[in-house]
Every structure is written in structure tokens, then in C-alpha cells.
Amino acid sequence: MTVPCIPRGPVMADIAAFRLTEEEKQRLLDPAVGGVILFRRNFQNIAQLKELTAEIKALRTPELIIAVDHEGGRVQRFIEGFTRLPAMNVLGQIWDKDGASAAETAARQIGWVLATELSACGIDLSFTPVLDLDWGNCAVIGNRSFHRNPEAVARLALALQKGLEKGGMKSCGKHFPGHGFVEGDSHLVLPEDGRSLSELEAADLAPFRIMSREGMAAVMPAHVVYPQVDTKPAGFSEIWLKQILRRDIGFKGVIFSDDLTMEGACGAGGIKERARISFEAGCDIVLVCNRPDLVDELRDDFRIPDNPALAQRWQYMANTLGSAAAQAVIQTADFQAAQAFVAGLASPQDTAGGVKVGEAF
């Protein structure tokens, strides 16, 4: 069978279960679509996951990019057969107790294990690290954050990024310019952060600035309003994305929207309007999760935005290790020692409980 050549479009969609339905295959063949995000509902075991990713990648060329939220703690979509990853605040605790060097070493090991295990299963990208500061206000962020100190967050995220790269994956910092100060969960409401730009610059923006300088591949903006800067949520704001992130910070990588079905995005109108505003604000790729009907509505008479960099940016997010090479790494003694080390961080301080993030129920 001839595999159709279809350039990757600017929409990342999802699927319902363990295998593709015929309807989903047709949806993923649409030129509007360029990637697939997987969730816990798509995982039964490692063998099934490998079959699913191979099925997705066999649909078209260039292959669809496959992503997942696999941060550690309560945001780890695949459990059985994978190393249990600690929540990132465990690294902050190591930073405070044992010093920066010990915490950075642990972060590199976590990134390596995280990325290599996913790479072996045909996954291109995990949406990590979380660069939000832990102000103690936001339950949906909470222990997903490394620390409250911007320097600690930046250094631990950079160490994690080095581990991810060793395992074949790029990094995606989120949620620009910072979701940690607000109380609301943008999956459920549209939060507001009333601080000034200078206050944000002094704290929350620092990790994004440092990581941009150090090769962070992608950014995901927050569905949060910062009214002293713009009345629009950051993901819909040209001020935040084109002026502050691109021009002032100098970020040159990929901008993924957060899920456009989240409540924090719904005030912008229907799905076509949300996507249009996201693209105009500066997003390269939009996520539409848990609502295949909205993906279909969006792709109906869809006009692909003029973005000459899109193909290159998509390709930049593709896995660089490959499943066979990753599987070979997993068999080595060094990697198995890293797995044991990482599992040891998670076991006594397991933080999988708490607010659930981004799953459909």
C-alpha cells in the first residue's frame, strides 16, 4: 500500500482508545493534522502502545508527531512497565537538602529515563518541563513545579532537558509566562494574575528566559489572563507571544497552544475562532483534546495558516533516538541503574495523588 505524502498541518488531535478506528484514521489523514497526543486511556501495556504508535506513524509521510504529558508524579500517563517518575518538587527538595549539584544529577537521570522509555515505544515528545514557580497558590500546578526559586527551576529544568536530549527528546517549557501564582485551574476556569510585567519579569519569566537561551525547543503558553499586560489569555495574546516571548526573550522554537477545549480557552468563541486567534497570536500548533467533534469542526473547510516555518518546526520535535536504539539502551546496566535510582526517588515520596490534570473522565 502506498503511504500518502501529506505535509504536517498545525493541529494536534487525540484518539479514543487502544487502537485506531477507521473514523480516526480518516481524521488523522487530514492535511490540517500534524500530530497526535496520547492519554492514559490509550495505554493498556507496552506491547499495545508500540503497536498503536506504529499504526499512527504508518498512516502518512512525513510521520505524524506523537506526544504525551509524561512529567512524573500525578501527570504520568503510562504506568505499567514504565519507571515510576517522581513529581518534580522532589528535585526541589533535593536542591534544598543536598544542594544544587545533587538535584541537577537527579534531574538529568529522570530526563534520561523518561525520554528513553517513551522513545522505545515510538513516542516523539513529552510536554515537559513545567517551568511554573511553586507559589503555593495553585493546586493544579503544585508539586508539578520544581521549586519557588526561579534559579532552581531554571537549573533543574536545564538538567532535565539534558537528560531528555540524551533519550532522544526535545523539551517543551510550560506554562508561559507562569501558571503558579493563580489559584484557579485553567482546565475549569479562566484564571487572572494581577501582577505587573515587572513583577513577572523578576520571577516567573526568568526560567523561560534562561531556558530559551539554553536551547529549549518548545513553549506552551497558559490559558491565564495577566490584565496589567493584556486583557487576552497568554495563549491568545500577540503581546505575550510575538512581543515578549519571540522579540524580547528571543525564543526561536515551537509554540504549542495548550488544549483549546479547556475552560480557560472557551471564552474566545467556537473552536475555529479559538484556533484562528491562537495562530494570529503566534502559536505554531494548536491542541484539541477530548473532543473529536471539535477537531472535525475545525478541519471542515480549514484554511491552513501561512507559516513557512511549520514543517521545520514539526520536524525539529521528532524523536532523534528511535525505538530500536532506545530499546537497546534500556538493556544496558547503566540505564537499569538509572531506572532504579529514579524509582527510588518516587517510591518513598509518591505524589501521584491530588488534582488530576488534563484527562477526560
Swiss-Prot record:
Pathway: Cell wall biogenesis; peptidoglycan recycling. It catalyses: Hydrolysis of terminal non-reducing N-acetyl-D-hexosamine residues in N-acetyl-beta-D-hexosaminides. The active site is at 187 (proton donor/acceptor), 258 (nucleophile). The record marks 185 as: Important for catalytic activity. Keywords: Cell cycle, Cell division, Cell shape, Cell wall biogenesis/degradation, Cytoplasm, Glycosidase, Hydrolase, Peptidoglycan synthesis. GO terms for biological process: carbohydrate metabolic process; cell division; cell wall organization; peptidoglycan biosynthetic process; peptidoglycan turnover; regulation of cell shape. GO terms for molecular function: beta-N-acetylhexosaminidase activity. It is an enzyme of class 3 (hydrolase). GO terms for cellular component: cytoplasm. Substrate binds at residues 69, 77, 144, 174-175. It is found in: Cytoplasm. Its EC number is 3.2.1.52. Plays a role in peptidoglycan recycling by cleaving the terminal beta-1,4-linked N-acetylglucosamine (GlcNAc) from peptide-linked peptidoglycan fragments, giving rise to free GlcNAc, anhydro-N-acetylmuramic acid and anhydro-N-acetylmuramic acid-linked peptides. PANTHER family: BETA-HEXOSAMINIDASE (PTHR30480:SF13), BETA-HEXOSAMINIDASE-RELATED (PTHR30480). Belongs to the glycosyl hydrolase 3 family. NagZ subfamily. This is Beta-hexosaminidase.
